[in-house]
A protein has these predicted regions:
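Glycan-recognition and catalytic cores of secretory/periplasmic carbohydrate-active enzymes
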Residues: 1-134
Length: 134
Protein backbone atom coordinates (compact mmCIF):
# COMPACT_ATOMS: atom_id res chain seq x y z
CA UNK A 1 0.00 0.00 0.00
CA UNK A 2 2.80 2.42 0.84
CA UNK A 3 4.31 1.94 -2.63
CA UNK A 4 0.98 2.90 -4.21
CA UNK A 5 0.73 5.96 -1.98
CA UNK A 6 4.26 6.99 -2.97
CA UNK A 7 3.46 6.58 -6.67
CA UNK A 8 0.26 8.62 -6.38
CA UNK A 9 2.06 11.37 -4.46
CA UNK A 10 4.97 11.49 -6.91
CA UNK A 11 2.69 11.60 -9.96
CA UNK A 12 0.44 14.29 -8.49
CA UNK A 13 3.21 16.55 -7.25
CA UNK A 14 5.18 16.37 -10.49
CA UNK A 15 2.08 16.97 -12.62
CA UNK A 16 0.75 19.87 -10.56
CA UNK A 17 3.76 21.74 -9.17
CA UNK A 18 4.20 25.12 -10.85
CA UNK A 19 7.86 25.21 -11.91
CA UNK A 20 7.68 28.91 -12.77
CA UNK A 21 6.12 30.36 -9.61
CA UNK A 22 6.10 27.47 -7.15
CA UNK A 23 3.08 26.03 -5.41
CA UNK A 24 0.55 23.50 -6.62
CA UNK A 25 -1.82 24.48 -9.40
CA UNK A 26 -5.46 23.81 -8.54
CA UNK A 27 -6.25 21.99 -11.80
CA UNK A 28 -4.08 20.45 -14.51
CA UNK A 29 -5.33 18.33 -17.38
CA UNK A 30 -4.03 14.76 -17.28
CA UNK A 31 -3.53 14.83 -21.05
CA UNK A 32 -1.84 18.23 -21.06
CA UNK A 33 -4.83 19.96 -22.65
CA UNK A 34 -5.91 23.42 -21.49
CA UNK A 35 -7.96 23.11 -18.28
CA UNK A 36 -11.58 24.24 -18.52
CA UNK A 37 -11.93 25.43 -14.94
CA UNK A 38 -11.72 29.18 -14.34
CA UNK A 39 -9.56 28.76 -11.24
CA UNK A 40 -7.21 26.21 -12.81
CA UNK A 41 -4.06 28.26 -12.29
CA UNK A 42 -4.84 29.44 -8.77
CA UNK A 43 -3.19 28.08 -5.65
CA UNK A 44 -5.56 27.09 -2.85
CA UNK A 45 -4.60 26.58 0.79
CA UNK A 46 -6.06 23.11 1.37
CA UNK A 47 -4.13 21.18 -1.33
CA UNK A 48 -0.94 22.64 0.13
CA UNK A 49 -2.03 21.43 3.58
CA UNK A 50 -2.49 17.99 2.07
CA UNK A 51 1.01 18.07 0.53
CA UNK A 52 2.49 18.91 3.93
CA UNK A 53 0.62 16.04 5.59
CA UNK A 54 1.22 13.42 2.90
CA UNK A 55 4.89 14.24 2.34
CA UNK A 56 5.60 14.05 6.08
CA UNK A 57 3.57 10.85 6.38
CA UNK A 58 5.52 9.27 3.53
CA UNK A 59 8.81 10.40 5.05
CA UNK A 60 7.79 9.01 8.44
CA UNK A 61 6.85 5.65 6.94
CA UNK A 62 9.64 5.26 4.35
CA UNK A 63 12.51 7.55 5.31
CA UNK A 64 12.56 8.76 1.69
CA UNK A 65 14.50 12.04 1.70
CA UNK A 66 12.67 13.23 -1.44
CA UNK A 67 9.45 13.32 0.55
CA UNK A 68 11.13 15.43 3.21
CA UNK A 69 12.43 17.73 0.46
CA UNK A 70 8.86 18.16 -0.84
CA UNK A 71 7.69 18.90 2.69
CA UNK A 72 10.22 21.71 3.13
CA UNK A 73 9.72 23.05 -0.40
CA UNK A 74 5.97 23.24 0.20
CA UNK A 75 6.37 24.66 3.70
CA UNK A 76 8.64 27.38 2.33
CA UNK A 77 6.08 28.26 -0.34
CA UNK A 78 3.25 28.32 2.21
CA UNK A 79 5.15 30.52 4.65
CA UNK A 80 6.08 32.98 1.91
CA UNK A 81 2.69 33.17 0.19
CA UNK A 82 -0.26 31.82 2.20
CA UNK A 83 0.73 32.91 5.70
CA UNK A 84 -0.05 36.45 6.83
CA UNK A 85 2.80 37.37 9.22
CA UNK A 86 1.03 40.54 10.41
CA UNK A 87 -2.52 39.38 11.19
CA UNK A 88 -2.11 35.61 11.25
CA UNK A 89 -4.05 32.85 9.51
CA UNK A 90 -3.58 31.85 5.87
CA UNK A 91 -5.00 33.41 2.76
CA UNK A 92 -7.26 30.89 1.09
CA UNK A 93 -6.70 31.74 -2.53
CA UNK A 94 -3.62 32.90 -4.39
CA UNK A 95 -3.11 33.93 -7.98
CA UNK A 96 -0.65 31.90 -9.99
CA UNK A 97 2.15 34.36 -9.14
CA UNK A 98 1.60 33.71 -5.41
CA UNK A 99 -0.14 36.96 -4.49
CA UNK A 100 -3.49 36.80 -2.67
CA UNK A 101 -6.58 37.20 -4.82
CA UNK A 102 -8.49 40.41 -4.26
CA UNK A 103 -10.33 40.84 -2.12
CA UNK A 104 -8.11 38.60 -0.02
CA UNK A 105 -9.95 35.85 1.82
CA UNK A 106 -8.96 34.13 5.04
CA UNK A 107 -12.41 32.88 5.90
CA UNK A 108 -15.50 32.21 3.83
CA UNK A 109 -18.22 29.67 3.22
CA UNK A 110 -15.55 27.39 1.75
CA UNK A 111 -12.55 28.29 3.92
CA UNK A 112 -13.28 27.52 7.53
CA UNK A 113 -11.15 26.50 10.51
CA UNK A 114 -10.60 22.88 9.45
CA UNK A 115 -7.78 22.23 6.99
CA UNK A 116 -5.00 24.32 8.52
CA UNK A 117 -5.53 23.31 12.18
CA UNK A 118 -5.90 19.67 11.10
CA UNK A 119 -2.67 19.94 9.11
CA UNK A 120 -0.77 21.45 12.02
CA UNK A 121 -2.08 18.90 14.51
CA UNK A 122 -1.20 15.96 12.26
CA UNK A 123 2.27 17.38 11.56
CA UNK A 124 2.86 17.87 15.28
CA UNK A 125 1.89 14.26 15.94
CA UNK A 126 4.11 12.89 13.15
CA UNK A 127 7.09 15.01 14.16
CA UNK A 128 6.68 13.88 17.76
CA UNK A 129 6.76 10.26 16.54
CA UNK A 130 9.89 10.94 14.48
CA UNK A 131 11.59 12.67 17.41
CA UNK A 132 10.81 9.70 19.68
CA UNK A 133 12.52 7.37 17.19
CA UNK A 134 15.71 9.44 17.06
Amino acid sequence: LIEKAQTIFDNAIHAGWDEEYGGLLYFVDAKGLPPESYEHDMKLWWPHNEILISSMMLYRDTGNEQDLDWFFKTLDYCQKHFSDPVYGEWYGYLRRDGLPTMPSTKGSTFKGPFHLPRCLMQLDQMMTELEARA
